[in-house]
């Protein structure tokens, strides 16, 4: 929360701007010949042969028809053919406006890494570009009829056929068994097609197949549809207990099939149904905010690949704790009770969603900062939250920075000329008020421009001689609107609200 010095983060020269809050000195991004391009990580992964490619599905169907018999009861299935159902698309927004328009469609899940690659876990943790002039490249599988927003550059990487999403198989009666030699039902056809496609592309192990024989007949224990579910918690070292992570977006991914669920107040979630093995992923974003892994990569916590198993997970990794704590505070400010305060900017009110960078470095006198000009450029995050030792520190810092964002939203055309003492004292007050809703004994440190004036107007503690009480946080926020100076804010409070202790405001604001 102190002043920043000029920093070199290895980015090309983009701009030098004044940080909107928590800092008064320019942050200059400097040229670095080692900047990574958007596709830098492709060379660190292994491209997989795609079983869902139309060309491979057609080969699989031809193989099934040549090797297996079709029973009389399944005569119609022998006429089944493969047609493109989905498109695997690479998307390259050229600016933040295009990125925001793209991501406004919450029916699609966009990944900043390709879906037909296998990456080591350590590479996935560092995914993204560090080139400040680049918007991330995104990958998605969409129905073939899907229309992308006009003007955004897209490239179809592969035509897909995803049988699990084909209405032809909606009426399958599931037994979990697939006959090895005869197509007698739609379930036999679906299972045989998938098994053959995965075999032809050397992905058979992903199906986790088991064989079963009875007399002259043999079956694959293919498995029926199942609904992924689980519970996400974390150890909160400030509360000294395991707590649920509410409001987190959980993805279940099986190649190009992606479904999602949101954790409830107890951390429980469930998603749509899948068949076979699928990977659980926590993608740390919601409609209005997007937590970044450092400056640019999407923050994710990658869970295991499971088949008919729930994922009950307690977060312990230090980076994942950082993501989870930023999320908990952001989710509170955007979606939960905030005592009638105004929310931070929604996705429709900025060029892109509120980007919050989880900076994994230990702070050098800085807990976090907010730059609206940096965020308005769209490429860089509006907010940065640095590594902390305790969970309540993450929470309070995130609330503080989002309070600046909400203040900016109240009157962005005047915000830059508001006195630092007003900005920081207000954000410090919101930090105290909202953080105590989760950490009841939370206390703030006050110094310089970071005064305790908001707390003093609310609490009944007269021990430090403030002698003001009885105001609420919404009243103080209402009086803050459009006020630029310390005295203007004080006078607006006096003007708008009657209070038996208001005669002591002059002393408090002195």
Language-model-detected regions and their locations in the chain:
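Post-HExxH zinc-binding segment in Zn-dependent metallohydrolases
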Residues: 417-456
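Pan-zinc metallopeptidase signature
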Residues: 44-81, 85, 449-510
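Active-site recognition of the HExxH zinc-binding catalytic motif
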Residues: 396-412, 424-428, 432
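Short, acidic Ser/Thr/Gly-rich low-complexity loop/linker segments typical of extracellular
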Residues: 254-268
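Long, solvent-exposed N-terminal ectodomains/accessory regions
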Residues: 25-176
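Short, ordered, surface-exposed loop/turn motifs in non-cytosolic proteins
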Residues: 54, 61, 71, 227-228, ...
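Short pre-active-site segment immediately N-terminal to the catalytic Zn-binding motif
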Residues: 382-398, 417
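Auxiliary, metal-adjacent structural segments of Zn-dependent hydrolase domains
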Residues: 322-388
